[in-house]
Amino acid sequence: MEPNPNRQPVELNRTSLYLGLLLILVLALLFSSYFFN
């Protein structure tokens, strides 16, 4: 009967996961650049 409150946390979790992956990728790029340099 109330799909909105159920969808919001799922979307937040997905966005948090995507943000975490992006942060990990950025950190990996920074570490790789430091190692290469």
UniProtKB/Swiss-Prot annotation:
Query: Where does it live in the cell?
Result: Cellular thylakoid membrane
Task: Report the domain of life of the source organism.
Answer: Bacteria
GO:BP terms for this protein? photosynthesis
Pfam families to which the protein is assigned, alphabetical: PsbL (PF02419)
Q: How does it sit in the membrane?
A: Single-pass membrane protein
Q: Which GO terms describe its cellular component?
A: photosystem II reaction center; plasma membrane-derived thylakoid membrane
Cytoplasmic topological domain residue ranges: 1-13
Q: What does this protein do?
A: One of the components of the core complex of photosystem II (PSII). PSII is a light-driven water:plastoquinone oxidoreductase that uses light energy to abstract electrons from H(2)O, generating O(2) and a proton gradient subsequently used for ATP formation. It consists of a core antenna complex that captures photons, and an electron transfer chain that converts photonic excitation into a charge separation. This subunit is found at the monomer-monomer interface and is required for correct PSII assembly and/or dimerization. This subunit may make specific contacts with lipid(s).
- From the Swiss-Prot or TrEMBL record, give the protein name: Photosystem II reaction center protein L
Protein species of origin: Thermosynechococcus vestitus (strain NIES-2133 / IAM M-273 / BP-1)
